[in-house]
Amino acid sequence: MEGGGFFPATRHSVLERIRAGNADERRHAFGDLIEGYWSPVYKHLRVTWRLPPEEAQDATQSFFAEAYEKAWLERFEPEKARFRTFVRVCADRFVMNRHQAETRLKRGGAVPQVSLDFAGAERELSPELTTRPEAETFFYQEFVRALFARAVAVVRTEFEATGRHVHLQLFERYDIDPEDGVSYSTLAAEFGLTVTQVTNYLAQVRRSFRTHAIESLRGLCGSDQEFRREAQDLFGVDTE
């Protein structure tokens, strides 16, 4: 991917939006933050802290409710850590003090409502439960998994809305869930396309995927500098 065209200059980080001061914008921005971070937080509580599913679900919801009400995440200082690390550390502190906090949780109010697919997260988690991975590495892996899943969902909506169903099928067959032996040639034969068409169709979907993934990443970082580092690490691109 070349140049800066994939990095919308108008998209502010979720932290900038939360700090903006407008109550409606803060609530909307916090909802975006929850969408990006709830799954890594939930899985971290399940795997690192060994919380049972139901307790981890309650703790995840309560953590974000408390963070919203107490403005914990607004205290982030970018020179000390990456924002995702700060979120994880805040979750750790919350769990350590969860017994004292439980009486103050789930007050509702203006906390943004986000649908959390705990069952889906649990299915993704199952193979991980036999060992306890290094916390930061595991949290990062799940952050990336959630980021990519959101980008794929947006791509599906975009391509289905424009009738590019074959593009999606190729993307799913080659990139999302490839079978042994799959190749551009086998897909071309199966779908009645040329190899060049398969190449071009996949390029379109991948370009859209990276655009949406990078846009989402920009929103979930704590600063422009952090975003540039994360984009370089994940996609090998320079956003300068």
Region locations from a protein language model:
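Intrinsic, short, N-terminal disordered tails of RNA polymerase sigma-factor systems
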Residues: 1-240
